[in-house]
Amino acid sequence: MISFSSFYQQIADSNLQHWLETLPSILGKWQRDHKHGNLPKWEKVLNKLHYPAPDQVDFVDSVTVGSGEQLSPGEKEKLENLLRLFMPWRKGPFHIHGIHIDTEWRSDWKWDRVKQHISPLKNRTVLDVGCGSGYHMWRMLGSGAKRVVGIDPSPLFLCQFEAVKRLAGTHHPVHLLPLGIEELPPLDAFDTVFSMGVLYHRRSPIDHLLQLRDQLRTGGELVLETLVIDGDENAVLVPQDRYGKMNNVWFIPSVAALMLWLKKCDFTDIRCVDTDVTALAEQRRTDWMPNESLVEYLDPNDITKTVEGYPAPKRATIIAVKNQPNQDLIS
């Protein structure tokens, strides 16, 4: 069974220690709720990942574990077969002992767009909301973060993350907790909070922004990346049914509307640092994710539109700072 005890020990003497009042019971319930289904099968695979400590790691320019020279061809083949049992791999890429996990998303491209605009992460405590399998968490560690905590309720993402961590070394201060943000108390503790690719999946985007705000210390930085449309501060797309074949997309605002929402939630120093139309080369079917991908979500006769006729995915990155508490929002 995946254990979270080392995380509990690490935060016991930190500004996250009050989280220990509720976290163990919440994670215990999650484990009980998932003792059937795929999780036990994936945990058995994790228990087979017994490999020597890597001769090198790189989290600065990539997520690379091992040089590729440590394992024999047979050992490498066995490892690749084990890692393929965690398919589909969506966020990456990862380079593990010479094995290239070519994920659906080129998450390194997103990181390259974001990293130049954020406050330096050196010695910061970071929260990554909706972290997936943890690719960006490793890059945050490579940027000097003191501790990185990711939350995502998916059992598969947790096991993919655990696989990489067990191969990279469990001593790294990077932790994935299978939680949704609604399960977090107001921690007011993180120096930087990332929410990338989450907002449009939330039924109440304003509540999501307030939940993100509750995790930041005063003066902490929010890095928000989400789908946007063109238009003024009143422009918000509410898909009738699906958007890009996704049935869990609720609100897609314009950049101006999103900045107004953040202002209403009492963020300050709000600025849009990047907008980018998602390229077919950034999200695509691969050998490690053989299902439908972006090209199938777009109109085959006009890739500027989704199959439903909406504008094709365009993403913006907004950075904002948590202001002093507003009693009206708290109440």
UniProtKB/Swiss-Prot annotation:
Enzyme Commission (EC) number: 2.5.1.-
Reactions listed under catalytic activity: carboxy-S-adenosyl-L-methionine + 5-hydroxyuridine(34) in tRNA = 5-carboxymethoxyuridine(34) in tRNA + S-adenosyl-L-homocysteine + H(+)
Positions of carboxy-S-adenosyl-L-methionine binding: 91, 105, 110, 130, 152-154, 181-182, 196, 200, 315
GO BP term, example: tRNA wobble uridine modification
Gene Ontology MF terms in the entry: methyltransferase activity; transferase activity, transferring alkyl or aryl (other than methyl) groups
Enzyme class label: transferase
InterPro entries assigned: CmoB, Mo5U34_MeTrfas-like, SAM-dependent_MTases_sf
Domain of life: Bacteria
CDD domains tied to this protein: AdoMet_MTases
Pfam short name (any one): Methyltransf_9
Alphabetic keyword roster: Transferase, tRNA processing
Family recorded in the similarity comment: Belongs to the class I-like SAM-binding methyltransferase superfamily. CmoB family.
Assembly: Homotetramer.
Biological role stated in the UniProt entry: Catalyzes carboxymethyl transfer from carboxy-S-adenosyl-L-methionine (Cx-SAM) to 5-hydroxyuridine (ho5U) to form 5-carboxymethoxyuridine (cmo5U) at position 34 in tRNAs.
The protein's name: tRNA U34 carboxymethyltransferase
